[in-house]
UniProtKB/Swiss-Prot annotation:
The record marks 165 as: Transition state stabilizer. It is an enzyme of class 5 (isomerase). It catalyses: 5-(methylsulfanyl)-alpha-D-ribose 1-phosphate = 5-(methylsulfanyl)-D-ribulose 1-phosphate. GO terms for molecular function: S-methyl-5-thioribose-1-phosphate isomerase activity. It comes from Acaryochloris marina (strain MBIC 11017). Pathway: Amino-acid biosynthesis; L-methionine biosynthesis via salvage pathway; L-methionine from S-methyl-5-thio-alpha-D-ribose 1-phosphate: step 1/6. This is Methylthioribose-1-phosphate isomerase. GO terms for biological process: L-methionine salvage from methylthioadenosine. It holds the Pfam family IF-2B.
Length: 355
């Protein structure tokens, strides 16, 4: 039996003269969109996580570069390129861990440098490129979903899959990476249930992953982060699939804080642990995960729920947004080009990369 995917979600949409973003800070209580017309506003949207998830940030940043190009007033080519590079620097400073952000900005800068003709022609090409980046990401995610489906355990026929954070349509241009595998498995009749870690402190699993599953009528069970090991011990989980914000050349993978703990639990219970991510998430210039910059966010994410403090005064805080899962804990990395052992990605995938 197969199922269909209903209510597709597209978090970054071009509307003729502005970008519409699904405001992910308001989900699941409220579905609303934010109109972005200036590059500075796009940078703020990325920083405040109105848009989040490495691929979605990349698409948003590409549109931010186009919007920034329209704000440049000079007719001098060198001056235009210099100001556009400044727009890129502002966007890059928003989220240091997500490599797709840097990839998209650099691609837009390269297009601007290589496009001949008047400034208006460069701007037109930048818009076309941003749209291509978004369309390519949807196709990429669907390929990731299909490749992921092909390596899921054959037994049981209908699997229970655990995921951490949100690597779904909301985190990409559409369809998702880890949830792309979920969608493909659901459509193929191979999925019984998703187990979603709540993902403290921002609760992307509780707020966003469950919301996506509910939209498409995919059975989903929410658990707190500390329950993952227990669920594995009780044989409730068959496979783990997560996303990534940056993957080093050796296969070490940075993802939302808590992913490393899930990987250790999966290893202890002999469960396959897959990372699903596009080629643009792999940083071939980074030898290993030790060099991945880890964003630290405001401590209020830890000590407040809503506007209520949950701990006494005098407590100190540490709030890294990501951790790095060592390659040896990863069963395979699912990309649009296939599924690869972490140690093979440099040899088998580096020739695919493009600026």
């Amino acid at each position: 039996m197969t199922a269909s995917v209903a209510n597709p979600v597209y978090p970054v949409v071009w509307r003729g003269d502005h970008v519409e973003l699904i405001d992910q800070t308001r989900l699941p209580q409220q579905f609303s969109v934010v109109e972005i017309r200036r590059s500075e506003d796009m940078a703020t949207a990325i920083k405040t996580m109105i848009v989040r998830g490495a691929p979605a940030i990349g698409v948003a940043a590409a549109y931010g570069m186009y919007l920034g190009s329209c704000e440049v007033t000079t007719d001098n080519r060198d001056g235009f390129l210099s100001e556009l590079a400044g727009v890129g620097d502002t966007l890059k400073a928003t989220r240091p861990t997500a490599v797709n952000l840097f990839w998209a900005v650099d691609r837009m800068l390269k297009v601007a440098r290589q496009t001949l003709g008047p400034i208006s022609q460069i701007q037109d090409q930048l818009l076309t490129t941003a749209q291509e980046i978004g369309a390519d990401d949807v196709r990429t995610c669907k390929a990731i979903g299909d490749h992921g489906l092909s390596v899921l355990p054959k037994d049981p026929e209908k699997l229970c899959l655990l995921t951490h954070c949100n690597a779904g349509a909301l985190a990409t241009a559409g369809y998702g990476t880890a949830l792309g595998v979920v969608r493909s498995a659901w459509t193929a009749g191979r999925l019984a249930r998703v187990y979603a870690d709540e993902t403290r402190p921002r609760l992307q699993g509780a707020k966003l992953t469950t919301w996506e599953c509910v939209q498409e009528e995919i059975p989903v069970t929410l658990i707190s982060d500390g329950m993952a090991a227990h669920c594995m011990q009780q044989n409730l989980i068959d496979v783990v699939v997560v996303g990534a914000d940056r993957i080093a050349a050796n296969g070490d993978a940075a993802n939302k804080i808590g992913t490393y703990s899930v990987a250790l639990c999966a290893k202890a219970h002999n469960l396959p642990f897959y990372v699903a991510a596009p080629l643009s998430t792999i940083d071939f210039d980074l030898a290993d995960g030790g060099g991945i910059p880890i964003e630290e966010r405001h401590p209020s994410e830890i000590y407040q729920i809503g506007t209520t403090d949950i701990c006494p005064k005098g407590v100190e805080f540490y709030n890294p947004a990501f951790d790095v899962t060592p390659a040896e804990l990863i069963t395979g990395i699912i990309t649009e080009h296939g599924v690869f052992a972490p140690g093979d990605i440099r040899e088998k995938l580096s020739h695919h990369r493009s600026a």
